From Swiss-Prot:
SUPFAM superfamilies: Trimeric LpxA-like enzymes (SSF51161)
UniProt entry keywords in alphabetical sequence: Acyltransferase, Lipid A biosynthesis, Lipid biosynthesis, Lipid metabolism, Repeat, Transferase
Role description: Catalyzes the N-acylation of UDP-3-O-acylglucosamine using 3-hydroxyacyl-ACP as the acyl donor. Is involved in the biosynthesis of lipid A, a phosphorylated glycolipid that anchors the lipopolysaccharide to the outer membrane of the cell.
Any one GO MF annotation of this record: N-acyltransferase activity
Organism listed in the record: Pseudomonas syringae pv. syringae (strain B728a)
Protein name: UDP-3-O-acylglucosamine N-acyltransferase
Biological-process GO terms, alphabetical: lipid A biosynthetic process
One GO CC term on file: membrane
Active-site residue list: H240 (proton acceptor)
UniProt cross-references to PANTHER family, sorted A to Z: UDP-3-O-ACYLGLUCOSAMINE N-ACYLTRANSFERASE, UDP-3-O-ACYLGLUCOSAMINE N-ACYLTRANSFERASE 1, MITOCHONDRIAL-RELATED
Keyword Zinc-finger: no
EC number: 2.3.1.191
Length: 351
């Protein structure tokens, strides 16, 4: 797919200040270093400012301070990365699906599918499903009994929704994601595990995105709940009964244990792990590889992951860490010895 749009049209769409030729044609996006004729680029990170000098981009998205002194065509905006995100959709080559049902799809007789939805090849849609207008169901998707998918949803090929999954409007779910799988619940008796039926479901709000191979387990009793605007990267595990507040984002390989509650506008970096039955308040940022073992009640940034260092230094640090208990005992003995000497000196002075 190719598209041509005039620079003035982009400026109007963004509400940007245009410096340059409004009639010049734009055909794509690229980085400052790789952009060529017909392409728009952007400067979001100050460390790339030096690339402005030699960029071949036809136009650049710039903040007012960076636009001063730039001789080329510019769209001046308060937030260049946000502006780039907004215009990126004009040039998205993702194929658009036509409304209708592929002849190989298997659909239950009582499923309610809006005529404006698109159902791909070999999709399976079970009894009681409701699919709203503008929804795209990719090839080989499985939509279990009584699932509901709101307007404008997009499911990539090979998405699996178990029964009783309810999805809001404009939700995007990438390939391999599984929503509504059984939670990891077992009762133990004399060393033997007995399965607990997971009778809840999964509820997603509006404008949620779920990455490739991410799993969201169904609740044991009530639903596992994902709030509006939540963004989940690839290969995330969300266990049963978890609740995630609106507009929280998580990078790849986060693992959240059962019944944990995460607030609104939180950010979890890659590889973060959370134990079960804890609560994270709104506005928390957790850095990569952090292990969260208790509730967080104050907004802010939290870390426990060990930062990289040269291997030789890391080995020395690891060796010292193994001796830390012994060092603590020696320090306690030294403190007691100093305290004894100090007390004796004080008695001598008093005498």
């Amino acid at each position: 797919m190719s598209i041509t749009i005039k620079l003035g049209q982009l400026a109007e769409f963004l509400g940007a200040t245009l410096r340059g030729d409004k009639d010049i044609e734009i055909t794509g996006l690229a980085t400052l270093q790789e952009a060529g004729p017909g392409q728009v680029s952007f400067l979001a990170n100050p460390k790339y400012r030096k690339l402005l000098v030699d960029t071949q981009a036809t136009a650049v998205l710039l903040k007012p301070a960076d636009a001063d002194g730039y001789a080329g065509n510019a769209l001046v905006v308060p937030d260049t990365y946000l502006a780039y995100a907004r215009i990126s959709h004009f040039f998205d080559p993702k194929p658009k699906s036509s409304a209708g049902v592929h002849p190989t799809a298997v659909i239950a007789a009582d499923a309610l599918i809006d005529p404006a939805a698109s159902i791909g090849a070999f999709a399976v849609i079970e009894s009681g499903v409701r699919i709203a207008a503008g929804v795209t169901i990719g090839a080989h998707c499985f939509i279990g009994a009584r699932c509901e998918i709101g307007e404008g949803g997009w499911l990539a090929p090979r998405v699996t929704l178990y029964h009783d999954v309810r999805i809001g409007k404009r939700v995007v779910i990438q390939s391999g994601a599984v929503l509504g799988g059984e939670g990891f619940g077992f009762a133990q008796d004399k060393g033997i595990y007995h399965k607990v039926a997971q009778i809840g479901g999964v509820t997603l709000g509006d404008d949620v995105e779920v990455g490739v191979n991410t799993a969201i387990d169904r609740g044991a009793l009530a639903d596992t709940r994902i709030g509006n605007g939540v963004k989940l990267d690839n290969q995330i595990q969300i266990a049963h009964n978890v609740q995630i507040g609106d507009h929280t984002a998580m990078a790849a390989c986060v693992g959240i244990s059962g019944s944990t509650k995460i607030g609104k506008h939180c950010m979890l970096a890659g590889g973060v792990g959370l134990v079960g039955h804890i609560e994270i308040c709104d506005g928390v940022f957790i850095t990569g590889m952090t292990m969260v073992t208790h509730s967080i009640t104050e907004p802010g940034s939290y870390s426990s992951g060990t930062a990289m260092q040269p291997a030789a230094e890391w080995r020395k640090s690891a060796a010292r860490l193994r001796k830390i208990d012994d060092m603590a005992r020696r320090l306690q003995k030294l403190e007691k010895a100093i305290e004894t000497v100090t007390c004796a000196d004080n008695r001598s002075s008093d005498g």
